[in-house]
Amino acid sequence: VRNVNLSRILREATTQVFVSGKEGEVNGKSLSQLEQLHTNHRDENSQNHTFVIPYYQNFSADLGNDAKLKSNSSGMLIATQRELPNDYGVLGIYTGFENAEQKVNAQRLDLDGNSYYAGLTYNHSFYEDDLTTYFMNLTTKLDYIERDVTKTYLGYIGSASSTAKVFGYGANARVGLSHYLKNDAKITPQIGFNYLGMHSKPFTLNHLGGTREHYYSQNFNFIDAVATIKYETPWINRFKTAVALGTIINVYKDAEGTLHLDNNFLSSELDIARLYGVVQGGISYDLTKDSDISLGYSGIFSSANTIRSHAFMFRYAWWW
């Protein structure tokens, strides 16, 4: 259960920070004149922004007692956004899926399966001057995770298997500003909070010899404080690079799970790192007047270096 939840936490951090900052770039009205000079598109009549992000993520996590979780996953995020009338902001909808293969070799544990998620976004610039835009954005998320859990016995004489199902929900809130520097670069600091909730359905591993390992239905809740800063630079008419640094601090968790093993009831707190650091970078290229592509990297590292995550993303976006 901890492995499934950790995977969701890292996916949330990877996609949120990487996508943030792009939501406001919907049409010419929401861009400064400097940015329009360098992007060479974003027609003011374009009210819609759509993008697709296929991605690959690899991470490892030290779980204690010499156990290490290793995971490889790939997925795709698809989103579309539209500017609301009368400068009321930008409303968007997104959906995505992910396939993951995870292993804990010391426990001879395999977890394979899919995730599906969707949500809404809202972005609003509430004050602008010549070089600075102040904004806020909100994101909601619902998701469903299904993992086939297989426990192989010592000596590989057999295995026990079951299916874990987790329903997730959450919301994120950010406030920040985008400021243009003398070299036409843009710096964007943001602060905010994440709420992440999960409900796992009960499941059972029936072992050889009749031992029954039953996991009860469980609820988990996390609240994180988030701070990021992104620096974007236009190099020539079509190229732009971006680098982002961030930190995620867990300020609240309600994450106790219960296991019934034969006649024994065991309870344990879901142990996760309290502090995460995020490093991201990317390069974008304008294909046409109304479309661009970009390549991005996202690294996540936890306090005490117990978690190391690397994600690589390709992004295709168009305005219409």
Name each model feature, range by range:
Residues 166, 184, 222, 226:
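Short, well-structured alpha-helical interface segments that form or flank functional binding sites
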